Regions:
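N-terminal export leaders
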Residues: 4-9
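Short, low-complexity N-terminal intrinsically disordered segments enriched in polar/charged residues
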Residues: 11, 19-51
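Short, solvent-exposed secondary-structure junction/capping segments
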Residues: 41, 45, 50-73
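Surface-exposed, charged secondary-structure patches
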Residues: 60-123
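Low-complexity, intrinsically disordered terminal/linker segments enriched in charged
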Residues: 107-111, 115, 119-128, 134-135, ...
C-alpha cells in the first residue's frame, strides 16, 4: 500500500514537472505528416502534386489554400509560372528522399508544429510545418524552409 502511494506521488510529481512541449502530440497530426512524406520515399514515387484545387485544400488550411489557388490561377491566365515553383513539402523540384524523421509537438489548442528531417539527394534537409486541426482533420497553416520567407509570406508579400 505504501509502495503504491509512493509510486502515485512520484508519478504525479513527474507529470507536473514535465515541460508542456514534451507532452505527446495528437497521433493524428503525426499520421497526417507521415502520410505527406510517404509517397516521396517510394522508388519513382510521384510525391504529392498540388495540381488541383482539391489537392491543395487536402493539405492546407483554407486561407493558405486560397492564396495558393488564386496565385496559380493568375499565373495560368498570364501564361506564367506560379509563385510556388517547387514542391513545398521537400523544398525542391527533384528528389530522392531517405531517412525521414517526423517529430510533432503540440503548441496549443488544435495547433502543432511538425519538424520533418530527411536527406534529399544525400543533402540533409529540414522542413517545419505549422499545423492546425480543423473539423475535417489536420491541415498546414505555414511551412518554414529555414529561409527568410515562409510559404504564407511568399503569397502575402506578392
Amino acid at each position: 500500500m505504501i509502495a503504491r502511494r509512493r509510486f502515485l506521488v512520484a508519478l504525479g510529481i513527474g507529470i507536473a514537472l514535465a515541460p508542456i512541449g514534451a507532452i505527446a502530440a495528437d497521433p493524428s497530426a503525426t499520421s497526417f505528416v507521415e502520410a505527406i512524406y510517404a509517397p516521396y520515399q517510394v522508388k519513382d514515387g510521384k510525391g504529392n502534386p498540388l495540381d488541383s484545387d482539391a489537392a491543395v485544400k487536402h493539405y492546407f488550411e483554407p486561407r493558405v489554400a486560397a492564396l495558393i489557388i488564386r496565385d496559380r490561377n493568375k499565373a495560368a491566365k498570364r501564361g506564367d509560372v506560379s509563385t510556388l515553383d517547387m514542391d513545398p513539402f521537400i523544398d525542391a523540384q527533384d528528389w530522392d528522399i531517405s531517412a525521414v524523421d517526423v517529430a510533432v509537438r503540440d503548441t496549443g489548442a488544435e495547433k502543432a508544429v511538425a519538424t520533418v528531417s530527411f536527406k534529399n539527394l544525400g543533402k540533409p534537409t529540414t522542413v517545419v510545418l505549422d499545423l492546425v486541426k480543423l473539423r475535417d482533420g489536420w491541415r498546414i497553416a505555414d511551412i518554414n524552409w529555414g529561409r527568410k520567407r515562409t510559404l504564407r509570406a511568399l503569397f502575402i508579400k506578392r
